[in-house]
Regions:
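Helix N-cap at the start of a conserved alpha-helix in ABC-type nucleotide-binding domains
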Residues: 67-69
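A short, surface-exposed alpha-helical micro-motif characterized by mixed small hydrophobic
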Residues: 97-99
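H-loop/switch region of ABC-family ATPase nucleotide-binding domains
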Residues: 91-92
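Catalytic Walker B motif of ABC-type/P-loop ATPase nucleotide-binding domains
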Residues: 56-59
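Conserved catalytic motifs of ABC-family nucleotide-binding domains
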Residues: 52
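Conserved ABC ATPase "signature" region
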Residues: 1-27
Length: 136
């Protein structure tokens, strides 16, 4: 359905590629109501990427994923970055964000309190910033 909606050329091949990338190949013929919450989350991400958007907005995509799902998502996000796609990742987990991001923006109550390229960020000082924001 979504491939027709987006006009995806060769939709079966594209869907199969994303299903494999997200580690859902074994269960692709299973009804989604039998999927775990992590599998459903990975399926939603695959569906969002079906039409190869240039901008991808992901709000807490690691939520509900097991360690394997997190690893698959991290690999996928890094690949999207190397393909030149823009990914806006919203997360409360600094380490996840740092691993896949080129630039990190920290917001507090709708205001930007820190913005820097990933290479300039020291995790320890960032952890201190996070706890200072949480306390306030």
């Amino acid at each position: 359905f979504f491939s027709r909606l987006y006009g995806v050329p060769d939709p079966e091949e594209r869907a199969s590629e994303l299903i494999d990338r997200m580690g859902l190949g074994v269960s692709q013929h299973q009804l989604t109501r039998g999927y775990s919450s992590g599998m459903k989350q990975r399926l939603k991400i695959a569906r969002a990427l079906l039409h190869e958007p240039q901008l991808v907005l992901l709000d807490e995509p690691y939520a509900g994923l097991d360690q394997h799902g997190c690893r698959l998502l991290t690999v996928l996000l890094k690949r999207l970055r190397t393909e030149g796609r823009t990914v806006l990742l919203i997360t409360h987990n600094l380490r996840e964000g740092l691993e896949v991001s080129a630039r990190v923006v920290v917001m507090n109550h709708g205001q930007i309190v820190h913005c820097a390229p990933r290479e300039e960020i020291e995790v320890d000082s960032f952890d201190k910033l996070y706890f200072r924001l949480v306390e306030n």
